[in-house]
Design a protein with these regions (language model features):
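Surface-exposed amphipathic alpha-helical tracts and adjacent flexible/coil segments at the periphery
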Residues: 1-5, 14-428, 432-597
């Protein structure tokens, strides 16, 4: 069977694809945000099959990196239970009215299939999750036809795709590398009813023109025993059914030709007879009705066998290594968004075990901000192959300055940092949900890993900590990392050839304080991310200083995550955690106590 990684692994570089190939995976579903250029680079530089998301709903966030559904809707989008907060109204720096800045149109790459084939794409993915069977039939039929005939869609086929489901049309913006407001849309209230189209799809199941499954039939008719019919397909399924005991012929005996003719009548089913073997003893008789019933029973049994859930194979599970658990209280670590959040008072007060600084901020440093903690560079959550030379240069600069650790949030980071003599620590983007994840990362030579903030306290406690574990205990939790810049979509800014933002009218707001406002008035800070992307933060900071539970979970590190805080506020938070001070102001306990579906 094929071992492949879904798009929830957030793989978008050839280095990430090679990393999973080394682990035995044979196919990777790359991120939906990948452009044609990105896809070609991955196809040319990795040894595994590449699958591209070609048709269906687009998540606003990089798949596998969304905390919005869990923290706001109580359902984990990272584990397939998305509550679809993207489809709700929001305002950017304004009250939420009838704007939908997170609602992307569905992707449609039907006109790009030949281009994909030429660059080496092995498979296209068509989304059918939570859709009607008729929708799946319409979409699959058109894409299969285009692939078989090696062409693009006609105007009528495009109209059928849109009628089946769309949100004010489709987009191929990611594929073309063209982001912006044109990629967004909602399902209009007056959308055409696909009733007739879906009815036609239902009727098509009954037509002979549908692709059928070739089967081999073997029938035996002998005196004194029930007749038998065995039907086999080319996928290894085989069934045998029995019929009545044949009678002695009174007038005309059954012969092999008549028996074969009866068995070959598979019309109206999903099967066609490819080969038929009939063995009939002389002087016997079976009625036409009995033979027809025998054939129907056999084909029905084969259909059930093909639809049955495959037998779950028991694979050997290697034992976990010894746990690296500690009974001591976790040591504090600190992550900042900007260098301005660091101050001598902060470093002296908390004496953190580690300080995490975005790699982009390293270029602003002339020397380490202080002594005592271990200084760690945080790699961008999202980047592309073309960015890696610049990132490698920044990593070398960080090493020369005295940084000794790197925070890894994606498997594609690993080939980027190898050979630079850094200690490797896992970030929350790796989605550590269980002990096996920790063991896997230990095999990758990581020395610690931050567990998912979707876990409950009890689940974190029960982890077999074969690797030193860290958890976020303070800060605005990241809700989304988006390829589209939400502020740019509102202001009309554009990017120049150097990737710098050029405002259309007035000063650029992309790097200024911006918020996303929901229907309740909650404001979610929008922070700029590497590559002119956007990271949406929760409206309330997580606060656990007064909850002793997080100190009794076997964690080695507890992270204070600073995003929008001033330098003074950072110092105050550290002091609160040292004093186990009670909560004040607007805050959240996250999912550590209430959990998530």
């Amino acid at each position: 069977s094929l071992a492949y990684l879904k798009d929830k692994m957030s793989l978008f570089t050839s280095g990430g694809a090679r990393e999973i190939a080394a682990d035995g995976c044979e196919r990777v579903v790359i991120a939906r945000e990948c452009s044609a250029e990105d896809t070609r680079t991955i196809c040319e530089n990795c040894p595994v099959e590449v699958e591209v998301f070609a048709h269906g709903a687009l998540c606003m966030c990089y798949s596998g990196q969304c905390g919005m559904s869990a923290l706001i809707g109580g359902r984990s989008g990272n584990r397939g239970r998305c509550a679809q907060p993207c489809r709700l109204p929001y305002g950017v720096n304004a009250p939420a009215k009838k704007a939908y800045p997170l609602s992307l149109k569905d992707s449609c790459l039907a006109g790009r299939l030949e281009e994909m084939g030429a660059m080496g794409v092995s498979c296209v993915k068509l989304e059918g999750r939570m859709k009607r069977p008729e929708y799946v039939a319409v979409i699959t039929r058109i894409y299969a036809r285009l692939l078989e005939e090696g062409r693009g869609p006609t105007a009528d086929e495009r109209a059928e795709l849109e009628q089946a489901f769309s949100r004010s049309g489709f987009t191929d913006g990611y594929w073309r590398g063209r982001h912006g407001a044109a990629m967004f849309g909602t399902r209009p209230e007056n959308a055409p009813d696909p009733k007739d189209l879906f009815e036609e799809a239902r009727r098509a199941y009954e037509r002979d023109s549908l692709r059928t499954v070739p089967v081999d039939l073997s029938c035996s008719v002998s005196a004194g025993v029930p007749c038998t019919l065995t039907v086999s397909d080319r996928d290894g399924h085989s069934v045998t059914v029995t019929g009545p005991v044949p009678e002695a012929a009174r007038t005309r005996a059954l012969d092999g030709l008549e028996l074969e003719a009866r068995l070959r009548k598979t019309g109206g089913t999903a099967f066609r007879c490819a080969d038929c073997a009939a063995q009939v003893a002389g002087g016997l008789f079976l009625s036409a009705g009995a033979l027809n019933a025998l054939r129907r029973d056999a084909l029905s049994a084969l259909e059930e066998a093909r639809c049955a859930v495959p037998h779950r194979r028991e694979l050997p599970v290697p034992p976990l290594p010894e746990a690296d658990c500690t009974a001591e209280a976790p040591r504090l670590t600190i992550s900042v968004t900007r260098l301005e959040q660091l101050s001598p008072a902060l470093l002296e007060l908390g004496c953190p075990a580690r300080v995490y600084i975005p790699l982009e901020e390293v270029s602003r440093l002339e020397s380490l901000p202080g002594e005592g903690p271990e200084w760690c560079a945080v790699l961008p959550r999202v980047w592309r192959d073309r960015d890696e030379p610049a990132l490698r240069t920044l990593l070398e600069r960080a090493r020369a300055l005295g940084f000794t650790g790197v925070l890894i949030g994606n498997l594609g980071h690993l080939p980027l940092v190898r050979g630079l003599d850094f200690h490797l620590y896992g970030d929350y983007g790796l989605n550590v949900f269980n002990s096996r994840s920790l063991a896997y990362l230990k095999d990758k030579e990581l020395e610690s890993a931050c567990v998912s903030f979707e876990l409950r306290f009890a689940q974190i406690r029960d982890l077999k900590k074969v690797l030193r574990a860290e958890a976020i205990v303070y800060g605005r939790l990241p809700l989304m990392i988006t390829e589209n810049c939400l502020v740019q979509n509102e202001t009309g800014c554009r990017l120049d050839r150097q990737g710098l933002c050029v405002p259309e009218d007035g000063p650029c707001r992309c790097g200024q304080p911006n918020v996303l406002v929901d229907r309740t008035g909650a404001a979610f800070p929008l922070l700029p991310a590497y590559g002119h992307r956007t990271e949406i933060q929760n409206s309330k900071p997580l606060y656990l200083a007064d909850r002793p539970e997080h100190r009794r979970l076997g964690l080695a590190y507890a992270r204070l995550r600073f995003t929008t805080e001033t330098a003074e506020e950072c110092v105050s938070v550290v002091q609160n955690y040292l004093d186990a001070a009670p909560a004040a102001g607007d805050f959240t306990r996250g999912l550590y106590e209430r959990g998530v579906e």
